[in-house]
Amino acid sequence: MTEDNNKAAGAKPRPARQVRTGLTSTGARKASAKSNRSRAREFALQALYQHLVGRNDPTEIDHFTRDLAGFHKADAAHYDALLHGSIEGAEQLDALIRPLLDRKFEEISPIEHAVMWIGVYEFQHCLDVPWRVVLNECIELAKEFGGTDGHKYVNAVLNGLAPQLRAAEVEADRASGKARA
């Protein structure tokens, strides 16, 4: 049918096709566009949330999380490192984060707290992941799972820690113009 025939037959015109950007309407990446490491971070965030809120046993949290739909698409080794490394190093991670906070930990959302743990842990232990990728991934986690402006808080804290924890990498990016001075 031609356009004229559609009008004559009373058919409604088709809506324009949506551009596939890999983003949801909220700006978060669609599940199909996520890497296995991004998925690992999401599952680690959920597990760390259970730890922070419910004070559940890490082994039980781990077993529960591995049974969730979609876990098979995640990088299990990265998930293990983030979950167990963050829980085991919680005091050290909090000690690094605390000086950059403008409030007590008790007043911070457990989502933002867990995201900051993930970011600081990755800054320290996942040197194969560029610092800007760590920062961006954590901002995305906070946008997707956290409060309205939680991602801004996470960004400020992690951006403040990056020069301390990844000094050479941050300085190289600043010198090349890839990061702000």
Curated annotation (Swiss-Prot):
Q: Does ATP-binding count among this protein's keywords?
A: no
MF terms (GO), sorted A to Z: RNA binding
- Does Magnesium count among this protein's keywords? no
InterPro entries xrefs: NusB-like_sf, NusB_fam, NusB_RsmB_TIM44
* Residue numbers spanned by region Disordered: 1-36
A biological process (GO) of this protein is: DNA-templated transcription termination
Q: Which cellular component, as a GO term, is one annotated location?
A: cytosol
Q: Which UniProt keywords apply?
A: RNA-binding, Transcription, Transcription antitermination, Transcription regulation
Extract the Pfam families matched here. NusB
The entry assigns this protein to a family as follows: Belongs to the NusB family.
Describe the function of this protein: Involved in transcription antitermination. Required for transcription of ribosomal RNA (rRNA) genes. Binds specifically to the boxA antiterminator sequence of the ribosomal RNA (rrn) operons.
Q: Which NCBIfam families match?
A: nusB
> Which HAMAP family does UniProt cross-reference here?
NusB (MF_00073)
Q: What is this protein called?
A: Transcription antitermination protein NusB
Q: What is the organism field in this record?
A: Variovorax paradoxus (strain S110)
Gene for this protein? nusB
